[in-house]
């Protein structure tokens, strides 16, 4: 298929074909991605490694004067975005490491990696041969089995432990996911992985209906681990609202709104809180604490930015109209009160004027 496409489009190049060896290097054997690096080395300034089922959406622009040894690109799937290193300077000995969720590495170290920002994203569609025709939960359950075996061979590999927890979570094995995330959180290492592990522990405890103090404590632990991330506060606002505690929900929503979307983090940024969720939570409960103008502003901004799903439009519009009526009533009452006060002042002036004349 690739040869035919190249011929039809008159694209020059070389095609290498070999048996599948796994994604990355493991157990002393090179993986297929490493083999691809070896075949491509020196044949272009940079090499772009991309899965055949992924697609580039938006306006991607490669730097005009590239200087980094590798570039990290923004990925998106569902409600999450993350960064993955995919473009590599082709004069180094790059290789991939790991049986699953492999990562690139190179010698000699150190090497420079930059991010490519812009209005684009790589859509990770997971439509490869090993995923076609099976339920996603089954796919991730299989991944978990592979990672269980990998950990037996390499028990100190923190990346394996993290993605084992991820695979349990994505296959809806909540108890196993909770235990695996807890294990990963104790191993230290990359702060973002530790944060996300503790955050997901709170999510698992929520799904498993653990006592509220445990859930609350875990969300707060994740927030304390990385206070530059708003996701834990968003979840606390949402859960407090759902359980009839609007004042607490308001406080957490206000805190969450003060945290901008992180630009330096690379691991699984949950977009909903930053794009519209925090505003929505504030708009949903501001009336309960008498903050009608703030609720109106939140709903107005939501509607103007229009980042929420269509399924939420009717509810958000209803909240907006309700706030409009309340604020209009308050302003009208204030206007009437101001008129009454002005009239009182006029009457007082008249009385004082008469008293002054009588005194003379």
Feature locations, PLM:
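"A position-specific structural signal for the A-helix of alpha-solenoid helical repeats
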Residues: 163, 200, 235-238, 281, ...
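Structural motif corresponding to the intra-repeat A-B loop/turn of tetratricopeptide repeats
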Residues: 171, 208-209, 243, 289, ...
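Short coil turns that delineate tetratricopeptide repeat
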Residues: 155, 189-192, 227, 261, ...
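Catalytic-site signature of metal-activated, phosphate-bearing donor transferases
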Residues: 24-37, 46, 54-179, 189, ...
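Start-of-helix register in tetratricopeptide repeats
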Residues: 159, 192-196, 231, 277, ...
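Acidic donor-binding segment of Leloir-type glycosyltransferases
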Residues: 1-17, 251-258
């Amino acid at each position: 298929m690739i040869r035919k496409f190249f011929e039809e489009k008159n694209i020059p190049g070389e095609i290498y074909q070999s048996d599948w060896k796994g994604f990355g290097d493991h157990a002393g054997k090179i993986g297929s991605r490493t083999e691809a690096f070896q075949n491509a080395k020196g044949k272009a300034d940079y090499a772009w490694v991309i899965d055949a089922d992924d697609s580039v959406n938006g306006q991607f622009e490669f730097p005009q004067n590239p200087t980094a040894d590798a570039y990290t690109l923004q990925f998106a799937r569902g409600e999450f975005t993350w960064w993955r290193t995919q473009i590599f300077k082709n004069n180094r000995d790059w290789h991939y490491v790991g049986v699953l969720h492999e990562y690139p590495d190179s010698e000699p170290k150190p090497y420079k990696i930059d991010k490519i920002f812009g209005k684009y994203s790589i859509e990770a569609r997971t439509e490869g041969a090993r995923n076609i025709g099976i339920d996603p939960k089954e796919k991730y359950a299989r991944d978990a089995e592979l990672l269980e075996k990998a950990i037996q061979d390499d028990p100190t590999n923190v990346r394996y432990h993290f993605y084992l927890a991820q695979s349990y979570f994505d296959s809806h094995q909540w108890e196993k996911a909770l235990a695996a995330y807890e294990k990963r959180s104790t191993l230290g290492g990359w702060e973002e992985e530790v944060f996300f592990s503790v955050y997901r522990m709170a999510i698992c405890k929520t799904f498993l209906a653990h006592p509220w103090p445990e859930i609350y404590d875990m969300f707060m632990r994740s927030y304390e681990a990385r206070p530059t991330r708003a996701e834990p506060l968003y979840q606390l606002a949402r859960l407090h609202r759902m359980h009839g505690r609007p004042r607490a929900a308001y406080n957490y929503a206000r805190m969450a709104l003060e945290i901008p979307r992180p630009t330096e983090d690379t691991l699984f940024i949950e977009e909903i809180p930053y794009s519209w969720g925090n505003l929505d939570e504030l708009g949903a409960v501001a009336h309960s604490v008498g903050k009608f103008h703030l609720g109106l502003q939140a709903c107005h901004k939501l509607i103007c930015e229009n980042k929420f799903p269509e399924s939420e439009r009717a509810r958000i519009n209803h909240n907006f109209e309700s706030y409009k009526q309340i604020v209009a009533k308050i302003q009208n009452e204030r206007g009437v009160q101001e008129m009454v006060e002005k009239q009182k002042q006029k009457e007082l002036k008249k009385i004082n004027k008469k008293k002054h004349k009588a005194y003379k």
